[in-house]
Amino acid sequence: MAAVAKRTVTDWQLKPALGLAPLDQGRARQELAEIAAAAREEGLARLAKFLAGKGAGQDFLAAVFDLSPFLRDTSRRRPRILDALFDQPVEARLEAITAAIEQAPLAETVSESSLMMELRQCKAEAHFLIALADLAGEAETSLTVRRLSDLADACTRAAVDFLLRDAHGQGKLKLPDLDNPSLQSGWILLGMGKLGAHELNFSSDIDLVVFFDPDAPAVVDRLDATELFSRLTRRLVRILQDRTEHGYVFRTDLRLRPDPGSTPLAIPVEAALRYYEARGQNWERAAMIKARPVAGDLAAGAAFLRELQPYIWRKYMDYAAIADVHSIKRQIHAHKGHGEIAVKGHNVKLGRGGIREIEFFVQTQQLIAGGRFPELRGRETVPMLGQLAARGWITADARDALARQYWFLRRVEHAVQMVADEQTHTLPEDDEGLERIAHMLGFGDAAAFSQAFRASLLQVERHYAALFETAPELSAGIGNLVFTGDVDDPNTLQTLQGLGFQRPSDICRVIRGWHFGRYRVTQSAEARERLTELTPALLKAFGQTRRADEALIRFDEFLAGLPAGIQLFSLLQSNPALLKLMATIMGAAPRLAAIITRRPHVFDGLLDPALLTELPDRVYLSARLSAFLEGDRAYEEVLDRLRIFASEQKFLIGVRLLAGSIDPARAGRAFSDLADLTIEAALQAVTAEFAARHGTIAGGVVSLLGMGKLGSRELTAGSDVDLILLYDHDADAEDSDGDKPLAPSHYYTRMTQRLISAVSAPTAEGVLYELDLRLRPSGNKGPVATHIDAFKKYQRQEAWTWEHMALSRARAIGGDTGLCAEVEAEVAAVLGQPRDAAKVKTEAADMRAMIEKEKPARDLWDIKLIPGGLIDLEFIAQVAVITGQVGAGPRATGTAEILSRLAPGFADAGARQELGAAFALYLALTQMTRLCLTGSFERDDVPPGLSDLLLAVTDLPDFGVLEAHLKETSQKVRKDFDLLLRAGRP
């Protein structure tokens, strides 16, 4: 790069920060002298004197006029533009021009021809100044594109305001405010592409999409509205782009509107919304990312875009969008000259490593994830690179490199266009032309520029290719794989056996079924083509699960349930880590495989690159849930979204456990936090819906008490949820105050039944949780909702020892904060009551003996029921709590924490360590088996992949050692149980 020139003090307000070198020094000085002469002819003595002088400013202008014929000719015709910079700096002058543009349509004597002249003169001056400031280094490229976009906005708004006032004058519209013609006019003009993103280039056309609201206050005749607004739009294009003696304002393109070949220039909003919902394509979704109301009725434009949000930002991540958008890029590459990275003749916008690749890099990821993460919905390219990096979708290196190269390439693009104000993106093919561009950018010569330009393209291409352009050989080097026809290929059978498949002929038959399009997901030719490309990698991944046949059959069942589309294959093809995870699920985790087979949308969350690094704690889950429920929603929709959210998050918590990014204890807390949040949200929805029908009870409040594994925050993937619903109200409360009043007890009983239905009823979106309310006072014989006073009385006067043991895990999970605090205090008080410790231990030991007799363990792997298993540990912890044998500190409900805090007089340090280690082992095995299996653990039918997972989570070398360790641990626990609770009793 050329050295930064030393600033010199002149009366001229533009101080060049860059020293530019002309192509020909003598010619440059001659051109400067000619412009000085033009200034003298115009009577601009101070400008003529300045141009005849010497200094950095004059050197800069001489170079500019030599390098850019467009800027030179503009200066010759209109030297007053340069002269104005003696009185105002560039920014102030641009503001004055913008103000003049805004006032132009409001002048009393304005006509269409006078407006066209005014806009062209203002635009020409602003255009010149923006270019000059850019070349001088006075403005960063980001400011240059913003200035160009603001100029286009102002010109478009001025033309629109003139046309609206004109239509008002003819009685075609009735504008509410002539000083603000666009207000409530119903005419919507959306800027698309670079205009919408405030990223306009120097000689760009502007892309507009035009809609109108026939019900807007200004519309006089709804039936004439389409013709009226289309006519106004046609005139708008003429005002902006027709070439006159004063030039043009902006070339204007309306082809991004819905179905441009058969629709009017202005489309009613309802028709547009119907089109996008029923027929909109992914490229149109991509285009709408950058859409921005730029003129006309801005409020109506914003409202229209809000209506479009569900179309642009899908509820589920959309993988098909990648292939769709990328196919456009492939078509662009098919054009001559775009296949190789070159400098001369290279298309800076569309060529390899060009601007479009950076834009597509950002846009495709926005399409995929913007529905889930609102922060990824921005219009501007570089800020979105920052957001993608912040969310972990791209590396900081990719962000910095692509942002740096984006602005560099935009500077190159501007230089190419500033030469002659032509809408071109192609570098010159001749030596002098390339030298000119190099000098405009501050390089010493074309060679230095070419080196930097080529390095930029290669850097962009490297990041872009890493995201999109993986194209493995179909055989992937693993042997013959032929699945055409209806006869098995012998070499293919051999390849499959080598990969680990036990029934290669059956596998061939399954794969041939895919290629025949027997499933909805494989019915299109493109889908089958993608699956063909993916099959070798699939077979290799499934072969590595050590139960290849079962893994592939489960994957086949998964495919059978998918809707038509190619999303999955595109995703797996471009993401080997995800393919490996999918194979692990299919080979080692039948339960998870069944979940994604029934509910394929849960697979969407696996695309989030932050999945394995972000901890699913309560704050994380709460934020995700809030975003998922945002907006005003109907009751049933809220419940459905809760079911969708819970099923997906259970799956993703499980995947984290499977991948080893969280440990079993954290998984238990995450499953429990998820249940807390979603059940409380369901309670809020039920309460509001119930109150709308039945009103409220005076002073009525509700608290949910989590029991069992929910209370102790030890839920597994397949756990039911134990709850007690408690309520309170004013002492003198009568019937509820709604249209259908209910007495208090009946009111809360009905509300609880509604909650049970909301949470546990099977629906198209599945079940939120299976609820169990049997731990409430009097169990199934008691009412489903319990008044707080009745709860207190029961716990203090009637509850059995086992009920107080169960209460030791109780935790308020939702509802009114005041009542929750009261419930927590009451639970603590009940647990702290004096008890006969010997009697409690005896009753607990007898209870355990009865369970052992009536429900003996099936085998060693029945971890809950085996002697010395989970129940033994839980009973020890619960007895310690209700007999006051837990160390000082906040009340604990988790078994692990209670065992670690057993009082020294109850259990010595050795026993505490032994019991804690046993619980950690049991928790790890239980979490993993409940995650992977739907039924019980069958020792002789364990998927090898699950065996590997169990060894990984317990850090043991082989399955035999694991079983020996499990047996030894249970024997130690039973010994401790006998010592602590049986106290030597036989």
Swiss-Prot record:
Enzyme class per UniProt: transferase
Alphabetized GO MF terms: [glutamate-ammonia-ligase] adenylyltransferase activity; [glutamine synthetase]-adenylyl-L-tyrosine phosphorylase activity; ATP binding; DNA-binding transcription factor activity; magnesium ion binding; sequence-specific DNA binding
Matching Gene3D superfamilies: 1.20.120.1510, Beta Polymerase, domain 2, Nucleotidyltransferases domain 2
Record-level GO cellular component terms: cytosol
Keywords from the UniProt entry: ATP-binding, Magnesium, Multifunctional enzyme, Nucleotide-binding, Nucleotidyltransferase, Transferase
SUPFAM superfamilies: Nucleotidyltransferase, Nucleotidyltransferase substrate binding subunit/domain
Chain spans, region Adenylyl removase: 1-470
InterPro entries assigned to the protein according to its UniProt record, in alphabetical order: GlnE (IPR023057), GlnE_rpt_dom (IPR005190), HTH_AraC (IPR018060), NT_sf (IPR043519), PII_UdlTrfase/GS_AdlTrfase (IPR013546)
Example GO biological process: regulation of glutamine family amino acid metabolic process
Annotated region (Adenylyl transferase), positions in chain: 476-986
Pfam families: GlnD_UR_UTase, GlnE
EC number: 2.7.7.89, 2.7.7.42
Cofactor(s) needed by this chain: Mg(2+)
Annotated catalysed reactions: [glutamine synthetase]-O(4)-(5'-adenylyl)-L-tyrosine + phosphate = [glutamine synthetase]-L-tyrosine + ADP; [glutamine synthetase]-L-tyrosine + ATP = [glutamine synthetase]-O(4)-(5'-adenylyl)-L-tyrosine + diphosphate
PANTHER family, alphabetized: BIFUNCTIONAL GLUTAMINE SYNTHETASE ADENYLYLTRANSFERASE_ADENYLYL-REMOVING ENZYME, GLUTAMINE SYNTHETASE ADENYLYLTRANSFERASE
Function: Involved in the regulation of glutamine synthetase GlnA, a key enzyme in the process to assimilate ammonia. When cellular nitrogen levels are high, the C-terminal adenylyl transferase (AT) inactivates GlnA by covalent transfer of an adenylyl group from ATP to specific tyrosine residue of GlnA, thus reducing its activity. Conversely, when nitrogen levels are low, the N-terminal adenylyl removase (AR) activates GlnA by removing the adenylyl group by phosphorolysis, increasing its activity.
Assigned protein family: Belongs to the GlnE family.
Protein's UniProt name: Bifunctional glutamine synthetase adenylyltransferase/adenylyl-removing enzyme
Source organism (scientific name): Mesorhizobium japonicum (strain LMG 29417 / CECT 9101 / MAFF 303099)
